[in-house]
Structure formats: structure tokens, C-alpha cells
Amino acid sequence: MDKLLIEGNGPLSGEIRVSGAKNAALPIMCAALLTPEPFTLHNVPNLQDVRTMLKLLRQMGVEGTQDGHDVTLDAAAIDAPEAPYDLVKTMRASILVLGPLLARFGHARVSLPGGCGIGARPVDQHIKGLQQMGAEIVIEHGYIEAKLADGAKRLHGARIVTDMVTVTGTENLLMAAVLADGETVLENAAREPEVTDLANLLVKMGARIDGIGTDRLVVQGVEALRGAEHTVIADRIEAGTFLCAVAAAGGDVTLRGVPPGILDAVLDKLREAGVTLTMGDDWIRVQMHGRPKAVSFRTSEYPAFPTDMQAQFMMLNCIAEGAALVTETIFENRFMHVQELNRLGANIITEGNTAAVTGVEQLSGATVMATDLRASASLVIAGLVAQGETLVDRIYHLDRGYDCIEDKLSAVGAKIRRIQG
């Protein structure tokens, strides 16, 4: 099992190009199932989850290739509209094939999902919405079995109000709705930039969607969609991770290929912490000297502070002047990094969904274990500032969501290298 060996060595300097967003690329790849025509994507990150999704689509009969950051997909000949457990268990986004398969082929069999162990993240909102659109769904032996009602040729439009804001639920129902008969209204829809990117791609394919970027999406179903070419948006969480790394280690780094507008909540908190930020249309320059100030924050749905940045920003508070409260409202069980950060000398106490962080002047290197994707990133940042060497174990979590993180950090002066396991 691979590990990362990191030596804390002071400020970072240079440029980093931000990769495409995994959380946009995966649903967009699933959208290829909606059309028999070819489909080309650019700026796709080179990640394990992308490779897993490609493998899943190929298993269904999709012709798919990846060349660097370009992916081509052709779903003209689907012979197995099924997502088996052995692939779905490693990646929750596999559930996103359910809506497209049901909409285009009228039936689907999808294993209940796996992925990071950071809470239940149920799929009941997906199922409830599809049932309102006329799907008959049963769950047997760990699989979601979905089909159209007897005699129905298509899903039908419906007004769907989800009980909570759900990103993958919005994406699944949106992809189902674009081929449904009639009008579908998605109330309480997720507004994340990745959802907007998917919606913009669907419009290129011929979908009729109003309200893109709002919490109310109105979809007029069409009979067929065409192929498309699309460039995936920048990964705002990767960008935020590098911003926190520079804020912690100090230095002067420019991030390229990322529009600042998708990161407003994180940028506001970084300014509160004392970070100097300058920016243009698709770049952000981050400058930091001295210790950050402790900043309290609360995670919530976009456009508020993202749960996927909670661990990284908590790490910044670990070495800050003062104390701060971190409140996690999206997922239960998302403080698994706390124990590992405390092993490095951090002072964090948790109670329920809140962590009280008191900043310390210095962390000390140690062997730590990654428990999920974003927890892994917080441990890498900790290693950049800790005295001595830090060994981060189980970094397969990191490889699921970060494209060459050690190479990008090395290029700006970090002492970090992968040890093959």
C-alpha cells in the first residue's frame, strides 16, 4: 500500500494548475448513457474514481477511452444496464448511472453504493423522486431494481421536492427528467457548481432546462439527446486544498485554471485567517507570512462553506493563533481526521458535530493513517508544516480525489515523495 513521506520545510512558491473537478466529471460521464451518439470530454482529472467509472461504463457496453485529460465515450450499444457491487462498492458516484439507464432504456439494476466511510449518505431521495416519475423500484439482495410501469414507454414529468439538499440526488433526477415525458420540476435542488456544469452539458446535448444555478430546476423532457463536447470545470476542492496548504506553510503561490467565483465561501474564511489573495478571471494568487488567525466556520450546502473543505481548514486552525469552533452539518462521522491530527500535536476536542480547535505553535511529525479522501488532504497539509518527517499511510483515499498531489506540491517546493507499497 503506497504511502507519502513529507518533511516540513517552510514556505511554498510557484504555480499550480488546478485539475478538472472529479465531482463534475463523474456525473457528466454518466450522462453519456443518455445518447447513442459519441461524447467527448476535456479537462478530466486522472483519478482512480474516473478509471473506475470508465470501467463500469465499459462493462455496460460503452466504448470508452482516456487519453491524458480527454475522455471519449460512445454508448450506442449498451448490452448490460447494470452496475455490479464489485465496482459500485468503491465509488458512491456509481449510483449516478441509475437515472440515465432508466430514462433511456426503461430498466436498470444498480448495487447500493460504497465509497468513503463518512456517514450513511442514503439514496432514498433518488428512489423517491424516480418513483414519482413513474418508476417501479424494489431493493433486493443489495441491489436497486428499477423499471418503467407496465405499458409505459418513458418516465413522466413530476414535481419533486426532496427532503434535503442532495447533490447526487439532484444530478440523478435531472438526468432522468431530460428524457421524461412532460415537465419535471426539481424543488430544493442542489446549486453546487458541479450540478450547474452537468446541466450546461445536458443543454448542449439538447435538453431543455430552466433555472440552472438555482434551487428550482424546470425540465421539459425531450425524446432524444445528441452527443456533445464539453470541458469539465475546475476542481474547487483541489484549489481550496492548495490554498490551505499555502496558508499553513506560508509562501506565494498562484493557482491557474480556476475561476475564483466557485470558491467564495472558502476565500472569505482565508481572508479572515490573514491570507492575502489576489485574483483574475481564472487564477488566484495566495500569499501568507506568519501564523494564521483561528477562524470558526460551519459547513452547509453551496454557496456556504463546503463540507469537503472542513478537514483542510480545520488543519489550518490547528496551527493558528487563538481558538475556533468547527461545526459539521452535512455528514455525520466526518471528524475521523481529528485523532490523527492530535497525534501530530494538535489540540482538538470534539462533541457531537462540533470540534473545538485551539491553535498550537508547532506540530511534530509522526506516522498517521488516512481514513477518507479529505481527511487525507488535511494530513498532507499537516506534514508540510510539522517538524520532522510525517508518513501518511493508506493514501489510496487521496488517489481517489487528487490528481498527482505530490507532484504539484513538489513543484512549489514541498519535500514530499511517494513510497510504493
UniProtKB/Swiss-Prot annotation:
The protein's name in its UniProt record: UDP-N-acetylglucosamine 1-carboxyvinyltransferase
Alphabetical list of InterPro entries matching this protein: Enolpyruvate_Tfrase_dom, Enolpyruvate_Tfrase_sf, MurA_subfamily, RNA3'P_cycl/enolpyr_Trfase_a/b, UDP_GlcNAc_COvinyl_MurA
Free-text function comment from the UniProt entry: Cell wall formation. Adds enolpyruvyl to UDP-N-acetylglucosamine.
Pathway noted in the entry: Cell wall biogenesis; peptidoglycan biosynthesis
Main localization of the protein described in the UniProt heading: cytoplasm
Residues that coordinate or bind UDP-N-acetyl-alpha-D-glucosamine: 92, 121-125, 308, 330
Keywords assigned by UniProt, alphabetized: Cell cycle, Cell division, Cell shape, Cell wall biogenesis/degradation, Cytoplasm, Peptidoglycan synthesis, Pyruvate, Transferase
GO CC terms of this entry: cytoplasm
Residues reported in the UniProt entry to bind phosphoenolpyruvate: 22-23
Catalytic residues as annotated in Swiss-Prot or TrEMBL: 116
Organism whose genome encodes this protein: Ralstonia nicotianae (strain ATCC BAA-1114 / GMI1000)
Family stated for the protein in its record: Belongs to the EPSP synthase family. MurA subfamily.
One example GO MF annotation: UDP-N-acetylglucosamine 1-carboxyvinyltransferase activity
Keyword Transmembrane helix included in the entry's annotation: no
Pfam entry (one): EPSP_synthase
TM region(s), chain numbering: none
Enzymatic class: transferase
Example GO biological process: cell division
Catalytic reactions on record: phosphoenolpyruvate + UDP-N-acetyl-alpha-D-glucosamine = UDP-N-acetyl-3-O-(1-carboxyvinyl)-alpha-D-glucosamine + phosphate
Source taxon at top rank: Bacteria
Location in or out of the cell: Cytoplasm
Listed EC numbers: 2.5.1.7
2-(S-cysteinyl)pyruvic acid O-phosphothioketal sites (modified residues): 116
